Amino acid sequence: MENAVYVLLGITSVVCVAVIGWRAWMLRWNSVVPPELVTALADCRSREDAKNVRSLCEKNPSPLGRLIRLTVDRLDWPKDDNIDSLETAARHEIVHLERGLVVLEVIVGIAPLLGLVGTIAGMMTVFGDLGQTGLNDAAKLAQGIALILRATLAGLLIAIPSLIFWSYFSKKVEVLAVEMETLCDEFIRRQYRK
């Protein structure tokens, strides 16, 4: 039983590292909010400029680029309808940015529990053996208890970094979402000036 727990903890740790690497790569600031697009948005003053921005969005796909491209495509819509459409698309982009974070959240919960299951299974084995042989060798008992507590330690060593990165990535998604919202809002305000 303890071996199965260690295998599950090993799989959990590999998944944790993979998700952390994947999200770190996907949530790079410059890939979500490309600086060249931010500059183009700041320089965009007319509907003619908006066509150039749209072209830039097509060449450099990013969450911000997809939102701006959608907005440019709907500039002939009434402002409120364009904003509603943008808000819906933004929610989809945020869900896309949050992808994988639930895996880290689950690992935070299950890794310590898997460790605890390993510890309990090991304790049952140690005390079962103790019941059969008696308490003749206290050092052997202490070694057995130390060995089985490693499962709890392993679970915690997986859960703690998972919690740290889950918190970090969740906050980063929030900050990126606010930045995209601000840039889109400024762009729409300039395009619908009367």
Region annotations inferred by a language model:
Residues M1-A4, E93, L97-A111, G144, ...:
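Loop-to-transmembrane-helix entry motif
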Residues M1-L37:
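Hydrophobic membrane-targeting segments
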Residues Y6, A139-W166, S170:
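Pore-lining and gate-forming transmembrane alpha-helices of multi-pass membrane transport proteins
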Residues L8-G21, I107-V117, I158:
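Lipid-exposed faces of alpha-helical membrane segments in multi-pass integral membrane proteins
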Residues S31-V117, A121-L135, F165-K194:
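Predominantly long cytosolic amphipathic alpha-helical stalk/bundle segments
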